[in-house]
């Protein structure tokens, strides 16, 4: 199984996409994955800690309990992704798009989220209001009215 995950990582680095891959618990820590496509893939429990994910596309991906701590994911798309219990501590998420994503129990502690796309429902179902989120003024009124 370890060799399969290593081969998948080599494929990723060469072709910037995952096609019908199952990469549960894969480790992408500190990797440059800018512009990669992870659409509709099962990446549950995967770790992207410190990864460079600018404009990466996670649309429709299963990212339950994934770790994005300290990741740089400006412009990343998480449209329709399942991110329940994921962590974005200290992540840069400027212009990240979370439309229709499931964010139950997601942590955004000290995340930078200027111009990120989040709905009121997503803010209330995540731990957003409990976390100190940097530059999230446009969301603050939603937390006050819980």
What are the roles of these predicted feature ranges?
Residues 17-146:
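Tandem repeat scaffolds
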Residues 2-11:
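Sec-dependent signal peptide recognition
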Residues 12-16:
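Hydrophobic membrane-targeting alpha-helices
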């Amino acid at each position: 199984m370890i060799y399969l995950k290593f081969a998948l990582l080599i494929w990723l680095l060469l072709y910037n996409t995952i096609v019908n891959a199952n990469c549960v618990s894969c480790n992408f820590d500190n990797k440059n994955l800018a512009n990669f496509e992870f659409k509709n893939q099962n990446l549950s429990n995967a770790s992207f800690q410190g990864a460079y994910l600018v404009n990466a596309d996670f649309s429709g991906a299963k990212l339950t309990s994934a770790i994005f701590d300290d990741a740089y994911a400006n412009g990343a798309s998480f449209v329709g992704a399942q991110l329940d219990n994921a962590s974005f501590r200290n992540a840069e998420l400027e212009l990240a798009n979370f439309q229709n994503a499931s964010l139950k129990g997601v942590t955004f502690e000290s995340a930078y989220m200027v111009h990120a796309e989040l709905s009121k429902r997503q803010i209330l179902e995540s731990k957003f209001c409990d976390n100190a989120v940097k530059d999230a003024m446009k969301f603050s009124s939603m937390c006050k009215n819980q």
